[in-house]
């Protein structure tokens, strides 16, 4: 997720990234600006988050390269949580038109 969040909203950026990871059950990478541009301060907060919303690695206040290892445990987690069984395609048609 490329971003341009100022330092004053850093916590919003981090919270939204964690929420995206949890709701999609996917790894999420958030890449944010760092430094100063036009009198606006950016804290970076570039981070990798696992599908449980846990921060794997984060880089703040410096320009850096983030390298992370990810596991394939997500497939096993998705099987256990199987939200697809809750789908109701029979109801979708009445909401499409």
Task: List PLM regions with ranges.
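Active-site beta-loop-alpha substructure in enzyme catalytic cores
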Residues: 1-24, 28-30
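C-terminal beta-strand edge segments of enzyme domains
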Residues: 33-97
